[in-house]
Amino acid sequence: PVINDATLSDAAQAGLDRLCRVIPSGSEAPGTPLSSCTEEFVERFKAADLVISKGQGNFETLDAPGREVFHLFMVKCPVISQEVGAPMGSFMAMKRG
C-alpha cells in the first residue's frame, strides 16, 4: 500500500472478501494508473459493470477513456481544488466518462 491505502487484510477485516473477489492492482504507485496494473486487474476493471474509485490519488491517476468511473474523494490540494471547482477539504462524488 501507498500512503494510506487499504490493504487486502483491511478488506478482509471489513468483510469485503465475503461479498466479492478482492484482488490487488499490482501497482506500487499512489493511485491506480492502469498502465502499472496487472493484466488480471485491467481485465476485471474493463469487465466490471460499475467502477467506484475512492481517494484523490485514484481521481488523479485512474485514466480510463470511454469508461464510466464514479470517484469519491476529499479535495486535498490546490491543484485539484481548482480542477474540480471546490474548496480544499470538500468531499466529492464525481462521474467521469
Annotated model-derived regions:
Residues 1-6:
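Short, charged/polar "capping" segments at the starts of alpha-helices
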Residues 7-97:
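C-terminal functional extensions of proteins
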